[in-house]
């Protein structure tokens, strides 16, 4: 069993963006390819949780396993994706990554995983005052908590965190760059993120 593994969540419908965000162009490739390049430089095992509509397209782009949600919980949001990844790869800790934060750096995963310890169920960054539960790490013991929530038709990350012993880490305390956490939900945000990148 690995100590650490990565789970990339690419199962959302991207309704506000107008097309699958995982496949949006970024620095000569796509969001999903760029994110995986960053993650696989730090983590030996990574799995992508994909929506069935784009699974084949994602598989052609990446060299890691691409799976769908566990059938019983299909479409139940990020909790379903996280638990599906946990079932696919056995590890002590899982670094979670959405497919719409293309600025993420391999440094972030190094910092995040250095903060893990057995006394905690989760390590969650707080960036500019906001919790970032989808750019976080979760111990494998939260798997049972997620199943319980899904069985009760509870789907929010906040409901999971309320049941966990969470280590919250402030971005400024760990030298995390706030730009790593910018997520792209609309075409306007996408254009701005590309402008910011070209101005660096």
UniProtKB/Swiss-Prot annotation:
The residues the record assigns to binding Mg(2+) are 100
Task: Tell me its cofactors.
Answer: Mg(2+)
| CDD domains associated with the record | MobA
Sorted alphabetically, which Pfam families does this protein's record hold? NTP_transf_3 (PF12804)
The kind of enzyme this is, by top-level EC class, is transferase
InterPro entries in alphabetical order: MobA-like_NTP_Trfase, Molybde_CF_guanTrfase, Nucleotide-diphossugar_trans
Quote the catalytic activity from the record.
Answer: Mo-molybdopterin + GTP + H(+) = Mo-molybdopterin guanine dinucleotide + diphosphate
Q: What is its main location?
A: cytoplasm
Report disulfide bridges, numbered on this chain.
none
What free text does the record give on domains? The N-terminal domain determines nucleotide recognition and specific binding, while the C-terminal domain determines the specific binding to the target protein.
- Biological role stated in the UniProt entry: Transfers a GMP moiety from GTP to Mo-molybdopterin (Mo-MPT) cofactor (Moco or molybdenum cofactor) to form Mo-molybdopterin guanine dinucleotide (Mo-MGD) cofactor.
Q: Any idea what this protein is called?
A: Probable molybdenum cofactor guanylyltransferase
**Annotated organism of origin:** Bacillus cereus (strain AH187)
Gene name in the database record: mobA
